[in-house]
Amino acid sequence: MTFRIEKDTMGEVQVPADKYWAAQTERSRNNFKIGPEASMPKEIIEAFGYLKKAAAYANHDLGVLPVEKRDLIAQACDEILANKLDDQFPLVIWQTGSGTQSNMNLNEVISNRAHVLNGGKLGEKSIIHPNDDVNKSQSSNDTYPTAMHIAAYKKVVEVTIPCVERLQKTLAQKADAFKDVVKIGRTHLMDATPLTLGQEFSAYAAQLDFGLRALKNTLPHLAQLALGGTAVGTGLNTPKGYDVKVADYIAKFTGLPFITAENKFEALATHDAVVETHGALKQLAVSLYKIANDIRLLASGPRSGIGEILIPENEPGSSIMPGKVNPTQCEAMTMVCAQVLGNDTTISFAGTQGHFQLNVFKPVMAANFLQSAQLLADACVSFDEHCAVGIEPNFPRIKKQLDDSLMLVTALNTHIGYENAAKIAKTAHKNGTTLKEEAINLGLVTAEQFDEWVRPEDMVGSLK
């Protein structure tokens, strides 16, 4: 490998000759060999591409950056957004907690690439300075949180929400399709009064509907950008009106409703917006875990479990037991949910680390957030495609378990009283007989009365 010499305020550094990054990026590569290289999320790099381009335009509009430099910076940023420079961002999550080295990685790459675009060569002094031009009116302290918000907002709106909505729609369709399938209910994992399979699935659809609403309700806070606060939130070294103008450009370039933060001190020192939105992702994970767990239990069997629903058989389930098929989509979903719950713990703790004017756990918050948002999206699509759409009732099993249930006796409460109804249920359970047999044997009802009063289809109410 050949090298060139780059300089920063601490001296000279050898840098791979064919790479656009410079001294500070190389120092970070050497100082933080923690985990796989280039673990900084690609979404963060993309977000920096938007904000650096927006900053160049805002600085030009406000008279502090020449148009020639604006256009060269913007051209380099467009290449980042077009994925043409993906191999130029080698840094890891585990670096300074402000994300300073990643900010400088972007500054250096944009600076050197702009110089080459202008006809220069790597190793020459660039006509675009990484700090004075690319980072003009900025600090790592306001750029990295801005990149966090851009990346998180885009991921949630463009990826997570549509994928969860897809699964929610399928579950709502199943609720309607199963509205007349009467089955036994269960509370405390024990038999309870009847409901319809449609009512059961309507709860799942409603859970995701509420989760989506909660997620969308967090977006206005996440749309507020720290850019313009610079080092501690005061806006030092920015031209008047820069914060509003740069947010407007980011909104224009992304097509999303970003605005400047109401309070820059809050935007730098805390990341409550990220904690808040990830809390809604956690809510969805809690709901999805319950849904997937219920479905795998309802499908358990095929002969010795509950077996009230049939789910698609996608692959062999055992290397030793021939013919075994497992609820693999449910297991994958519940593992994803466990990961999201763990990520929420990390993000919540990281959110507490806003010491005075700066939170210094930014990269780990960003990485965990983006992983959660993507995993939930992928898991919802997989679960929908390979499980939910293929769920069907197992009618014989549903009927048998409904007929065998002792909790149908609840319908007799208003006719013979709770204590007499309990006596029928306990006697039938003890003797292994039916409710009807014991109700008649005990002389508490006639056969005709039992048939009239104990009708599962009349016990499910009118609620959908």
Swiss-Prot record:
List membrane-spanning regions: none
The active site of this protein is located at 188, 318
Give residues annotated as binding substrate.
98-100, 129-132, 139-141, 187, 319, 324-326
Question: Which GO molecular function, any one, fits this protein according to its record?
Answer: fumarate hydratase activity
List the residues marked with site Important for catalytic activity.
331
Q: Which HAMAP family match?
A: FumaraseC
Q: Which PANTHER family match?
A: ASPARTATEAMMONIA/ARGININOSUCCINATE/ADENYLOSUCCINATE LYASE (PTHR11444), FUMARATE HYDRATASE, MITOCHONDRIAL (PTHR11444:SF1)
Family as reported in the entry's similarity comment: Belongs to the class-II fumarase/aspartase family. Fumarase subfamily.
Its recorded name reads Fumarate hydratase class II
